[in-house]
């Protein structure tokens, strides 16, 4: 591949060795799909490709969360940025800020989501506040959600949306921990993920 952003041979991008070349058939297929969906091959993809069958399985979940949810893209991006902020994972924040902006999240909201968003509750809708309270408990209290928080969340979201948002937060929490454990290097700003459906 001549495009530098989609070059497999980037060398070491984490604490793991560089991806052996040429990539196997599963990895090549995943990379080709990423490019066909409008994204670049990211450092995280190169690291995950050390276990191609696991990477392929994870991509199915990621694809579903990005393209097949009932919950709005805006609230999903808020949940992702908030979760990434709580686990202090700049890698995912960098990739999701453009997606969140495209989904209708404001710059002021994005700034708040990475810090003490509750001090700026007025810039969020009641449904967004309910979701963010839930996510904070999900991450900071390790899933110990008080009934009052869950009940308020359930007033605004269907059971399917509750599961979608819970899986979104859980998925990005796990990804944040994985990125930190592997010490994956940040991608350049112009190397972007596939945007998915808005």
Region locations from a protein language model:
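Acidic/histidine-rich alpha-helical segments that form the ligand environment
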Residues: 123-167
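A contiguous pocket-lining binding segment that forms or flanks enzyme active sites
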Residues: 103-136
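Conserved alpha-helical segments that form or flank metal/cofactor-binding pockets of metalloenzymes
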Residues: 71, 75-109
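Short amphipathic alpha-helical segments and their helix-coil junctions
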Residues: 55-68, 112-115, 147-155
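Short acidic alpha-helix initiation/capping motifs at coil-to-helix transition points
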Residues: 8, 35, 53-57, 88-94, ...
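Preference for long, well-ordered alpha-helical segments
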Residues: 149-152, 159-198
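Mobile cap/lid helix-loop segments that border enzyme active or cofactor-binding sites
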Residues: 1-73, 197-198
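Short alpha-helical scaffolding segments that buttress acidic/His motifs in well-ordered protein cores
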Residues: 45-48, 62-65, 78-84, 113-114, ...
């Amino acid at each position: 591949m001549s495009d530098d952003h989609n070059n497999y041979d980037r060398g070491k991008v984490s604490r793991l060795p560089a991806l052996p070349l040429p990539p196997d058939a599963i990895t090549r297929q995943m990379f080709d799909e990423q490019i066909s969906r409008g994204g670049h091959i990211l450092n995280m993809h190169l690291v995950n490709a050390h276990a191609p069958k696991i990477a392929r399985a994870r991509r199915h979940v990621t694809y579903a969360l990005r393209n097949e949810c009932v919950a709005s893209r805006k609230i999903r991006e808020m949940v992702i940025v908030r979760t990434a902020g709580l686990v202090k994972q700049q890698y995912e924040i960098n990739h999701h800020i453009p997606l969140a902006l495209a989904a209708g999240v404001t710059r002021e909201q994005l700034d708040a989501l990475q810090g003490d968003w509750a001090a700026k509750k007025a810039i969020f809708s009641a449904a967004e506040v309910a979701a963010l309270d839930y996510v904070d408990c999900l991450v900071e209290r390790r899933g110990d959600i008080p009934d009052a928080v869950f009940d308020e969340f359930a007033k605004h979201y269907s059971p399917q949306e509750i599961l979608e948002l819970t899986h979104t937060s859980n998925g990005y929490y796990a990804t944040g921990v994985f990125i930190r454990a592997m010490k994956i290097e940040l991608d350049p700003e112009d190397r972007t993920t596939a945007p998915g459906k808005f």
